[in-house]
Curated annotation (Swiss-Prot):
The keyword Transferase applies. This is 23S rRNA (guanosine-2'-O-)-methyltransferase RlmB. The keyword S-adenosyl-L-methionine applies. The gene is rlmB. It comes from Salmonella typhi. It is an enzyme of class 2 (transferase). Its EC number is 2.1.1.185. Its main location: cytoplasm. Belongs to the class IV-like SAM-binding methyltransferase superfamily. RNA methyltransferase TrmH family. RlmB subfamily. GO terms for molecular function: RNA binding; rRNA (guanosine-2'-O-)-methyltransferase activity. It comes from the Bacteria. One of its GO terms (cellular component) is cytosol.
Length: 243
């Protein structure tokens, strides 16, 4: 069993973290890119078989996405399960979690993972039935974060949120109609940030299980932000308060 990853950053990040997972790599024939050369040398030094391929082959393997002239076939990484969450929480005095409710676009999932990694989030939680898959597109956008931040899919998000509350984790949800902003919120301790789907927001049951609702103040004419942008803003305000 194997999976494909593509893009310079995604391949490089996995090679640095888990070179043993690589089975083979495909490089665009005739591609002269200074960014690719060090990566090719690094792959060769790890004994990875490298094959030259035409653009049509790479486009097909990446479903027409921007692959930057490199694709790798790798062994699947660790798949975190719902029952791994308590152990992950126990590793930290102040767990810092991100919950994505209804983020179904793999580009947004990848961007949220990238922001989560940069902010030091310990795990990202998503519902099994209403979330984008962690496919090659999401991994490319994540620029390596998909290999470092545990992504946990849960069967019942509301039940998981209750479990977090039993672990004394404060759950902060985002909603445009919230009566105070993230800058008025207190987020220095054990916490989980909940982001809803773009346009729709959190589902009713998810919202009801939040301890607090916050909004992002908007000064211009637009009514909302892309979910990955909003996630980054909220995460780094939490980081500011936690440091």
């Amino acid at each position: 069993m194997s999976e494909m990853i593509y893009g310079i950053h995604a391949v490089q990040a996995l090679l640095e973290r888990a070179p043993e997972r690589f089975q083979e790599a495909f490089i665009l024939k005739g591609r002269e890119d200074k960014r690719l050369l060090p990566l090719i040398h690094a792959l060769e030094s790890q004994g990875v078989v490298i094959q030259l391929a035409n653009r049509q082959y790479l486009d097909e393997k990446s479903d027409g996405a921007v692959h930057q002239g490199i694709i790798a076939r790798v062994k699947p990484g660790r798949q975190y399960q719902e029952n791994d969450l308590p152990d992950l929480i126990a590793l930290h005095d102040r767990p810092f979690l991100l919950i994505l409710d209804g983020v179904t676009d793999p580009h947004n999932l990848g961007a949220c993972l990238r922001s989560a990694d940069a902010a030091g989030v310990h795990a990202v939680i998503v519902p099994k039935d209403r979330s984008a898959q962690l496919n090659a597109t999401a991994k490319k956008v994540a620029c390596g974060a998909a290999e470092s931040v545990p992504l946990i899919r849960v069967t019942n998000l509301a039940r998981t949120m209750r479990m977090l509350q039993e672990e004394n984790i404060w759950i902060v949800g985002t909603a445009g109609e919230a009566d105070h902003t993230l800058y008025q919120s207190k987020m220095p301790g054990r916490m989980a940030l909940v982001m809803g789907a773009e346009g729709e927001g959190m589902r009713r049951l998810t919202r009801e299980h939040c301890d607090e609702l916050i909004s992002i103040p908007m000064a211009g004419s637009v009514s909302s932000l892309n979910v990955s942008v909003a996630t980054g803003i909220c995460l780094f305000e939490a980081v500011r308060q936690r440091t």
